[in-house]
Amino acid sequence: MEQELVITKAKYINDRAYIPLTVMATNQQQKYIDLLTSKDAEVANKEMAEKLLEEYLPSVEKILKALTSMEEEASTFNGELEKLYKSALRLTYILRVRFGTLLDFLAGEETDGAKVNALLGQTFYDFHNSVLEFNNLYALIVKGEGTYNLNSESIPLVQKGMTYWEISDVLRMPCSVNKGDTYYWTSEEGNFTLVVTFDEEGEASHVHVNE
């Protein structure tokens, strides 16, 4: 019964949160980029803060309630469900702390444009990876589905012109590490490493695999 309760909550979070929040995260980032290209950073930061507060925060708060309720079941978790719980905690931290800091920073009267840009980009990057991780575990643990990994079937799906978000969604795994504009995805077995270099527009310009 306890595991069924946890799985029910996991389904709620996945079905109600994963797709909407991922789409919103990507859309909000694009809105911010659009603002920066059409207005000065100070005006763009203020408008982005207003958009985040108005469009994003209410949805985040709903998901936080669902995630927080999972904390009550911590003592009943074991094995794979423990992984799901820890992943949910990471997502909770990203939403509650990191986005809270971002909103406070953006809403401030005085902001440093460079710091805001860096904070915004890193927050969305970490948020996307944490949601991806949770959804991947959900598919494996709750649905009993296999998950994509770096292999001969998934590698051909990665093409030039794709963004980081598109590649990680196709592989259903975040990158292992990045060095500047070059990102690395390594298979769990360690026998494949996908190396992708992105251009200034954020699209893959070079893709190759090390075996």
Describe each region flagged by the PLM.
Residues 53-89:
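Short, solvent-exposed, charged loop/turn and helix-capping segments
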Residues 144-150, 156-211:
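A cross-family detector of function-defining hotspots
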Residues 61, 65-68, 72, 93, ...:
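Sec-exported extracytoplasmic/periplasmic mature domains
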Residues 42-54, 81, 151-158, 195:
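Second-shell loop/turn segments in exported
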Residues 2-53, 90-146:
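C-terminal amphipathic alpha-helix
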Residues 22, 29, 50, 60-64, ...:
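Extracytoplasmic/secreted envelope proteins and their assembly/folding machinery
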Residues 16, 30, 54, 75, ...:
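Intrinsically disordered, low-complexity segments enriched in small/polar residues
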